[in-house]
Amino acid sequence: MNRSQPINLINGKMYCQWPIFISECYESQYFIITYYVNLVTATIFTLLAGGILIMRLIAHRELNLLSNGIIAPLEGFLGFSMLGGIARIVCSVTLIIDVLPTYYIYREMISDAQWVTAQLSVITYLAGVFRTLPHMPFFQPSCSNHQSSTTNMTICVPTSYLIRILYWTISITLIIITSGSAMLAGYFRMKDNRFLLNVFTSIRLVAYGISCAILVIGYSIYGRLFINLTMQSFDLVQGQGEIIEEFQETHIIRDEREERRNLRFKYHIRKMKMFNNSALMTFTFWSLTSFILAFWHDQIWSTLFLSKIQAFIANISTNLIILTVLIVILLSEFVHHKGLDDETRNQLI
Protein backbone atom coordinates (compact mmCIF):
# COMPACT_ATOMS: atom_id res chain seq x y z
CA MET A 1 0.00 0.00 0.00
CA ASN A 2 1.52 3.33 -1.07
CA ARG A 3 0.66 6.96 -0.45
CA SER A 4 -0.68 7.58 -3.97
CA GLN A 5 -3.41 4.96 -3.70
CA PRO A 6 -6.81 6.06 -5.12
CA ILE A 7 -8.33 6.70 -1.67
CA ASN A 8 -5.95 9.65 -1.17
CA LEU A 9 -6.56 11.25 -4.57
CA ILE A 10 -9.06 14.07 -5.02
CA ASN A 11 -10.21 14.51 -8.62
CA GLY A 12 -7.28 12.32 -9.63
CA LYS A 13 -4.70 14.60 -7.99
CA MET A 14 -2.57 14.25 -4.87
CA TYR A 15 -3.54 17.17 -2.60
CA CYS A 16 -2.23 17.51 0.94
CA GLN A 17 -4.94 16.40 3.34
CA TRP A 18 -2.98 18.17 6.05
CA PRO A 19 -4.57 16.63 9.16
CA ILE A 20 -3.42 13.20 7.88
CA PHE A 21 -0.42 13.66 5.56
CA ILE A 22 1.69 16.51 4.16
CA SER A 23 4.34 14.62 2.18
CA GLU A 24 4.42 13.77 -1.53
CA CYS A 25 1.53 16.12 -2.32
CA TYR A 26 0.91 19.55 -3.87
CA GLU A 27 2.52 22.48 -2.00
CA SER A 28 3.79 20.13 0.69
CA GLN A 29 6.58 22.56 1.62
CA TYR A 30 4.05 25.09 2.93
CA PHE A 31 2.37 22.54 5.18
CA ILE A 32 5.71 21.19 6.42
CA ILE A 33 6.75 24.71 7.47
CA THR A 34 3.36 25.19 9.11
CA TYR A 35 3.84 22.05 11.17
CA TYR A 36 7.37 23.09 12.16
CA VAL A 37 5.91 26.30 13.60
CA ASN A 38 3.15 24.23 15.18
CA LEU A 39 5.80 22.04 16.81
CA VAL A 40 7.68 25.00 18.29
CA THR A 41 4.64 26.90 19.57
CA ALA A 42 3.01 23.73 20.93
CA THR A 43 6.20 22.88 22.83
CA ILE A 44 6.25 26.35 24.38
CA PHE A 45 2.64 26.37 25.52
CA THR A 46 2.86 22.76 26.76
CA LEU A 47 5.77 23.66 29.03
CA LEU A 48 4.02 26.85 30.12
CA ALA A 49 0.74 25.06 30.91
CA GLY A 50 2.61 22.37 32.83
CA GLY A 51 4.61 24.97 34.77
CA ILE A 52 1.53 26.97 35.77
CA LEU A 53 -0.29 23.78 36.78
CA ILE A 54 2.60 22.67 39.00
CA MET A 55 2.84 26.16 40.51
CA ARG A 56 -0.87 26.16 41.38
CA LEU A 57 -0.75 22.66 42.85
CA ILE A 58 2.18 23.65 45.08
CA ALA A 59 0.56 26.94 46.14
CA HIS A 60 -2.85 25.35 46.78
CA ARG A 61 -2.02 22.03 48.40
CA GLU A 62 -5.49 21.87 49.93
CA LEU A 63 -7.13 22.04 46.49
CA ASN A 64 -9.54 19.22 45.65
CA LEU A 65 -9.02 18.42 41.98
CA LEU A 66 -12.36 16.62 41.78
CA SER A 67 -14.69 18.90 43.73
CA ASN A 68 -18.40 17.95 43.59
CA GLY A 69 -17.67 15.39 40.90
CA ILE A 70 -16.21 17.94 38.45
CA ILE A 71 -12.54 18.54 37.65
CA ALA A 72 -11.30 21.85 39.11
CA PRO A 73 -11.86 24.41 36.31
CA LEU A 74 -8.52 26.18 35.97
CA GLU A 75 -6.46 23.10 36.79
CA GLY A 76 -8.56 21.10 34.34
CA PHE A 77 -8.00 23.70 31.64
CA LEU A 78 -4.25 23.67 32.24
CA GLY A 79 -4.08 19.87 32.37
CA PHE A 80 -6.04 19.32 29.18
CA SER A 81 -4.09 22.11 27.46
CA MET A 82 -0.87 20.34 28.37
CA LEU A 83 -2.20 17.03 27.01
CA GLY A 84 -3.37 18.81 23.86
CA GLY A 85 0.07 20.33 23.45
CA ILE A 86 1.69 16.90 23.73
CA ALA A 87 -0.72 15.60 21.07
CA ARG A 88 0.22 18.52 18.79
CA ILE A 89 3.92 17.78 19.28
CA VAL A 90 3.47 14.09 18.45
CA CYS A 91 1.27 14.92 15.45
CA SER A 92 3.75 17.49 14.11
CA VAL A 93 6.72 15.13 14.42
CA THR A 94 4.71 12.32 12.79
CA LEU A 95 3.71 14.41 9.78
CA ILE A 96 7.04 16.21 9.32
CA ILE A 97 9.17 13.06 9.45
CA ASP A 98 6.38 11.03 7.82
CA VAL A 99 6.34 8.34 10.49
CA LEU A 100 4.19 5.28 9.67
CA PRO A 101 2.93 6.87 6.44
CA THR A 102 0.09 4.44 5.74
CA TYR A 103 -1.00 3.66 9.32
CA TYR A 104 -4.02 5.91 9.03
CA ILE A 105 -5.72 4.76 12.23
CA TYR A 106 -2.74 6.05 14.21
CA ARG A 107 -2.66 9.30 12.22
CA GLU A 108 -6.39 9.92 12.59
CA MET A 109 -6.22 9.26 16.34
CA ILE A 110 -3.34 11.64 17.07
CA SER A 111 -4.92 14.30 14.88
CA ASP A 112 -8.19 13.87 16.78
CA ALA A 113 -6.42 14.00 20.17
CA GLN A 114 -5.41 17.63 19.52
CA TRP A 115 -9.01 18.76 19.18
CA VAL A 116 -10.77 16.62 21.75
CA THR A 117 -8.38 17.81 24.49
CA ALA A 118 -8.90 21.44 23.43
CA GLN A 119 -12.66 21.02 23.76
CA LEU A 120 -12.39 19.20 27.08
CA SER A 121 -10.25 22.02 28.49
CA VAL A 122 -12.89 24.70 27.85
CA ILE A 123 -15.80 22.38 28.75
CA THR A 124 -14.15 21.86 32.15
CA TYR A 125 -13.72 25.60 32.69
CA LEU A 126 -17.33 26.30 31.65
CA ALA A 127 -18.57 23.65 34.12
CA GLY A 128 -16.68 25.55 36.82
CA VAL A 129 -18.47 28.75 35.79
CA PHE A 130 -21.85 27.03 36.12
CA ARG A 131 -20.89 25.67 39.53
CA THR A 132 -19.74 29.08 40.82
CA LEU A 133 -22.56 31.30 39.55
CA PRO A 134 -25.27 30.38 42.12
CA HIS A 135 -22.93 31.27 45.01
CA MET A 136 -22.17 34.79 43.79
CA PRO A 137 -23.76 38.02 45.10
CA PHE A 138 -26.31 39.67 42.79
CA PHE A 139 -27.13 36.35 41.14
CA GLN A 140 -30.87 35.79 40.99
CA PRO A 141 -31.94 32.74 38.99
CA SER A 142 -34.91 33.20 36.71
CA CYS A 143 -36.34 29.94 38.01
CA SER A 144 -37.17 31.67 41.31
CA ASN A 145 -40.77 32.71 42.00
CA HIS A 146 -39.74 35.48 44.38
CA GLN A 147 -37.88 37.93 42.16
CA SER A 148 -38.83 41.50 41.44
CA SER A 149 -39.55 42.83 37.98
CA THR A 150 -36.54 45.12 38.20
CA THR A 151 -33.99 42.29 38.43
CA ASN A 152 -31.29 42.64 35.80
CA MET A 153 -29.51 39.32 36.24
CA THR A 154 -32.33 36.82 35.60
CA ILE A 155 -31.03 33.59 34.17
CA CYS A 156 -31.47 29.92 34.93
CA VAL A 157 -28.48 27.81 35.98
CA PRO A 158 -28.64 24.00 36.37
CA THR A 159 -28.27 22.45 39.81
CA SER A 160 -24.91 21.05 40.90
CA TYR A 161 -26.16 17.52 40.28
CA LEU A 162 -27.34 18.36 36.75
CA ILE A 163 -24.08 20.20 36.00
CA ARG A 164 -22.12 17.11 37.02
CA ILE A 165 -24.30 14.83 34.87
CA LEU A 166 -24.08 17.15 31.86
CA TYR A 167 -20.31 17.61 32.23
CA TRP A 168 -19.50 13.91 32.21
CA THR A 169 -22.17 13.03 29.64
CA ILE A 170 -20.96 15.64 27.14
CA SER A 171 -17.28 14.84 27.76
CA ILE A 172 -17.62 11.06 27.46
CA THR A 173 -19.98 11.29 24.48
CA LEU A 174 -17.59 13.63 22.69
CA ILE A 175 -14.63 11.31 23.30
CA ILE A 176 -16.51 8.20 22.16
CA ILE A 177 -17.99 9.73 19.00
CA THR A 178 -14.90 11.61 17.81
CA SER A 179 -12.28 9.02 18.73
CA GLY A 180 -14.45 6.16 17.48
CA SER A 181 -15.16 7.82 14.14
CA ALA A 182 -11.50 8.85 13.80
CA MET A 183 -10.42 5.25 14.27
CA LEU A 184 -13.04 3.98 11.81
CA ALA A 185 -12.15 6.69 9.27
CA GLY A 186 -8.52 5.58 9.45
CA TYR A 187 -9.53 1.94 9.10
CA PHE A 188 -11.67 2.55 6.00
CA ARG A 189 -8.96 4.72 4.46
CA MET A 190 -6.63 1.74 4.79
CA LYS A 191 -9.33 -0.50 3.26
CA ASP A 192 -9.79 1.93 0.36
CA ASN A 193 -13.50 2.44 1.15
CA ARG A 194 -14.15 6.07 0.24
CA PHE A 195 -17.87 6.04 1.09
CA LEU A 196 -17.45 4.92 4.72
CA LEU A 197 -14.35 7.08 5.07
CA ASN A 198 -16.45 10.13 4.17
CA VAL A 199 -19.30 9.01 6.44
CA PHE A 200 -17.16 8.71 9.58
CA THR A 201 -15.16 11.84 8.75
CA SER A 202 -18.45 13.75 8.51
CA ILE A 203 -19.76 12.25 11.78
CA ARG A 204 -16.66 13.36 13.65
CA LEU A 205 -16.74 16.88 12.20
CA VAL A 206 -20.47 17.30 12.89
CA ALA A 207 -19.87 16.20 16.51
CA TYR A 208 -17.14 18.84 16.83
CA GLY A 209 -19.39 21.45 15.23
CA ILE A 210 -22.22 20.76 17.69
CA SER A 211 -19.83 20.77 20.66
CA CYS A 212 -18.29 24.07 19.53
CA ALA A 213 -21.76 25.62 19.10
CA ILE A 214 -22.72 24.57 22.65
CA LEU A 215 -19.54 26.15 23.99
CA VAL A 216 -20.19 29.39 22.09
CA ILE A 217 -23.69 29.63 23.60
CA GLY A 218 -22.38 28.82 27.07
CA TYR A 219 -19.57 31.36 27.05
CA SER A 220 -21.60 34.10 25.34
CA ILE A 221 -24.32 33.92 28.03
CA TYR A 222 -22.88 32.46 31.22
CA GLY A 223 -19.25 33.44 30.69
CA ARG A 224 -20.16 37.11 30.29
CA LEU A 225 -22.56 36.91 33.22
CA PHE A 226 -19.79 35.43 35.37
CA ILE A 227 -17.49 38.35 34.52
CA ASN A 228 -20.18 40.95 35.25
CA LEU A 229 -21.09 39.37 38.59
CA THR A 230 -17.42 39.13 39.57
CA MET A 231 -16.99 42.85 38.93
CA GLN A 232 -20.11 43.68 40.96
CA SER A 233 -18.99 41.39 43.79
CA PHE A 234 -15.62 43.13 43.92
CA ASP A 235 -17.30 46.53 44.14
CA LEU A 236 -19.45 45.25 47.00
CA VAL A 237 -16.53 43.76 48.94
CA GLN A 238 -14.39 46.84 48.29
CA GLY A 239 -17.06 49.14 49.68
CA GLN A 240 -17.50 47.07 52.83
CA GLY A 241 -13.77 46.82 53.31
CA GLU A 242 -13.29 50.59 53.19
CA ILE A 243 -15.83 51.11 55.99
CA ILE A 244 -14.03 48.67 58.29
CA GLU A 245 -10.56 49.88 57.42
CA GLU A 246 -11.53 53.49 58.17
CA PHE A 247 -11.43 52.65 61.87
CA GLN A 248 -8.52 50.23 61.84
CA GLU A 249 -5.78 51.60 59.64
CA THR A 250 -4.02 54.76 58.77
CA HIS A 251 -4.82 56.44 55.47
CA ILE A 252 -1.49 55.42 53.90
CA ILE A 253 -1.76 51.73 54.77
CA ARG A 254 -5.37 51.66 53.59
CA ASP A 255 -4.41 53.17 50.24
CA GLU A 256 -1.57 50.68 49.78
CA ARG A 257 -3.79 47.72 50.54
CA GLU A 258 -6.52 49.02 48.27
CA GLU A 259 -4.00 49.51 45.46
CA ARG A 260 -2.76 45.92 45.79
CA ARG A 261 -6.31 44.62 45.86
CA ASN A 262 -7.26 46.63 42.79
CA LEU A 263 -4.19 45.37 40.93
CA ARG A 264 -4.99 41.73 41.72
CA PHE A 265 -8.58 42.27 40.63
CA LYS A 266 -7.46 43.99 37.42
CA TYR A 267 -5.35 40.99 36.39
CA HIS A 268 -8.03 38.55 37.51
CA ILE A 269 -10.67 40.24 35.34
CA ARG A 270 -8.20 40.49 32.46
CA LYS A 271 -7.64 36.73 32.72
CA MET A 272 -11.39 36.05 32.74
CA LYS A 273 -12.09 38.36 29.78
CA MET A 274 -9.19 36.98 27.76
CA PHE A 275 -10.32 33.42 28.38
CA ASN A 276 -13.96 34.17 27.56
CA ASN A 277 -13.25 36.21 24.42
CA SER A 278 -10.71 33.68 23.15
CA ALA A 279 -13.17 30.83 23.65
CA LEU A 280 -15.93 32.73 21.85
CA MET A 281 -13.75 33.72 18.91
CA THR A 282 -12.03 30.36 18.50
CA PHE A 283 -15.07 28.12 18.84
CA THR A 284 -17.33 30.30 16.72
CA PHE A 285 -14.82 29.87 13.90
CA TRP A 286 -14.40 26.14 14.46
CA SER A 287 -18.13 25.55 14.76
CA LEU A 288 -18.69 27.02 11.30
CA THR A 289 -15.57 25.38 9.86
CA SER A 290 -16.44 21.94 11.25
CA PHE A 291 -19.90 21.97 9.68
CA ILE A 292 -18.50 23.13 6.33
CA LEU A 293 -15.70 20.54 6.38
CA ALA A 294 -18.12 17.79 7.35
CA PHE A 295 -19.76 17.93 3.93
CA TRP A 296 -17.17 19.59 1.70
CA HIS A 297 -13.79 18.44 3.06
CA ASP A 298 -12.54 17.21 -0.33
CA GLN A 299 -13.43 20.54 -1.95
CA ILE A 300 -11.61 22.47 0.80
CA TRP A 301 -8.47 20.32 0.65
CA SER A 302 -8.36 20.51 -3.15
CA THR A 303 -8.59 24.33 -3.07
CA LEU A 304 -5.03 25.18 -2.05
CA PHE A 305 -5.79 28.74 -0.93
CA LEU A 306 -8.55 27.61 1.47
CA SER A 307 -6.57 24.61 2.64
CA LYS A 308 -3.53 26.74 3.47
CA ILE A 309 -5.59 29.28 5.40
CA GLN A 310 -7.31 26.56 7.39
CA ALA A 311 -4.01 24.82 8.20
CA PHE A 312 -2.53 28.13 9.37
CA ILE A 313 -5.48 28.93 11.62
CA ALA A 314 -5.77 25.39 12.98
CA ASN A 315 -2.11 25.18 13.91
CA ILE A 316 -0.34 28.51 14.27
CA SER A 317 -3.23 30.86 15.13
CA THR A 318 -4.82 28.44 17.59
CA ASN A 319 -1.48 27.86 19.33
CA LEU A 320 -0.86 31.60 19.63
CA ILE A 321 -4.31 32.12 21.17
CA ILE A 322 -3.66 29.36 23.72
CA LEU A 323 -0.23 30.81 24.45
CA THR A 324 -1.70 34.30 24.99
CA VAL A 325 -4.32 32.95 27.41
CA LEU A 326 -1.63 31.05 29.35
CA ILE A 327 0.57 34.16 29.61
CA VAL A 328 -2.36 36.17 31.00
CA ILE A 329 -3.06 33.38 33.53
CA LEU A 330 0.62 33.36 34.53
CA LEU A 331 0.67 37.15 35.06
CA SER A 332 -2.50 36.90 37.13
CA GLU A 333 -0.91 34.19 39.29
CA PHE A 334 2.25 36.26 39.84
CA VAL A 335 0.26 39.36 40.84
CA HIS A 336 -1.96 37.31 43.14
CA HIS A 337 0.94 35.65 44.97
CA LYS A 338 2.89 38.92 45.20
CA GLY A 339 -0.12 40.61 46.77
CA LEU A 340 -0.52 37.83 49.31
CA ASP A 341 3.19 37.96 50.20
CA ASP A 342 3.03 41.73 50.69
CA GLU A 343 0.02 41.42 52.98
CA THR A 344 1.77 38.72 55.01
CA ARG A 345 4.83 40.94 55.47
CA ASN A 346 2.66 43.87 56.56
CA GLN A 347 0.93 41.71 59.15
CA LEU A 348 4.31 40.63 60.56
CA ILE A 349 5.41 44.26 60.77
Where are these regions (language model features)?
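Juxtamembrane membrane-interface segments at transmembrane-helix boundaries in membrane proteins
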Residues: 15-38, 65-76, 101-113, 151-163, ...
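Helix-to-loop junction signature of class
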Residues: 2, 11, 84-101, 175-194, ...
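Seventh transmembrane helix
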Residues: 278, 314-348
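Extracellular/lumenal N-termini and interhelical loops of multi-pass eukaryotic membrane proteins
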Residues: 1-27, 88
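Class A (rhodopsin-like) GPCR signature focused on the TM5-ICL3 interface and adjacent 7TM helical core
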Residues: 208-243, 282, 325-330
